[in-house]
């Protein structure tokens, strides 16, 4: 499953909106992630756009982040992930991996992993979005998380990332 980020288009929304409407910014960002996934999918044969319900199968799947988050609700019917700028592609990817009990999650980044002792520290250094560590620490078991810097050769499993820190 590939969860594509929003990139520069989301950064522009963040700069232009400056907390005017956090929920709208959140959903616009998810829509951009989905549009980026569709664009990236066009470069691969035999890919599938996925949302929920999702059935694990072999193949290359791209997540429709907007639709997945729209369908991902708490018992009270509220969206599972907060509708704020604290939630971006990192948290969406982790939530999907938790939801479908994936054993591993690979975060593809454009910077090296910072000198961090846990995910909260990595959030504070803007390596992952601000909700990531809260989502991570809310689960007893998580996928093993690897980070890969696409602009260098760094591939790491930062810490025992499959359990709460």
Language-model segments: what does each one mean?
Residues 1, 60-64, 106:
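Structural motif
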Residues 99-117, 148:
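Glycine-rich phosphate/pyrophosphate-binding loops
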């Amino acid at each position: 499953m590939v969860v594509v980020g929003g990139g520069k288009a989301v950064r522009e929304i963040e700069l232009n909106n400056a907390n005017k409407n956090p929920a709208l910014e959140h959903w616009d960002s998810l829509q951009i992630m989905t549009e980026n996934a569709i664009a990236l999918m066009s470069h691969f044969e035999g890919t599938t756009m996925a949302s929920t319900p999702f059935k694990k199968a072999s193949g290359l799947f791209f997540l429709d982040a907007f639709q997945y988050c729209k369908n991902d609700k708490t018992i009270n019917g509220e969206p599972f992930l907060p509708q704020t700028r604290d939630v971006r592609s990192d948290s969406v990817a982790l939530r999907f991996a938790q939801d479908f009990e994936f054993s591993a999650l690979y975060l593809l980044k454009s910077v090296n992993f910072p000198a961090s002792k846990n995910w909260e520290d990595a959030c504070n250094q803007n390596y992952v979005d601000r909700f990531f560590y809260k989502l991570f620490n809310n689960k007893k078991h998580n996928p093993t998380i690897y980070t890969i810097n696409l602009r260098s050769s760094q591939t790491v499993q930062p810490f025992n990332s499959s359990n709460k820190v």
